[in-house]
Amino acid sequence: MSRIGKLPITVPAGVTVTVDENNLVTVKGPKGTLSQQVNPDITLKQEGNILTLERPSDSKPHKAMHGLYRALVHNMVVGVTDGFSKTLEMVGTGYRASVEGKKLTINIGFSHPVILEAPEGITYETPNQTTIVVKGSNKQQVGNLAADIRAIRKPEPYLGKGIKYQNEHIRRKEGKTGK
């Protein structure tokens, strides 16, 4: 058994999981609706509020798919109940961010501000001028958007200036030594 795939998924109250004939899993909850196409080899069984995934054989591809789709369905259930968030910090003089509606404006040392529009289901928050919080119900979308924001100005190794994840450790380098 796949260590991850064999774990059952507990579906909380207020969340409905439906599987159609094409193996499209749809999860509805208080924070929205998410859908994921599951490989036809993987079968989903729901008994009460427990959801389990099963595979046809112990071949390597089936084991891999078993764990993958179990994790994806579990992330959908967590996403529609609690949601996901990624926090980014900006380090540098004059670096700041602000939110106006669904637009995030970042001043990060360029000659122009960088403006990012939030896609459907994603919200931005700025608790202070140097912190950005990306929230949403789709874990992959939140992570990709946070990575895109970080890629605007990655932390550099000499001074540590740039955009980094909250608990990310930046490996620092020593500068040149004089003669």
Indicate residue ranges for each PLM-predicted region.
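N-terminal intrinsically disordered, cationic/polar leader segments
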Residues: 2-66, 70-147, 151-179
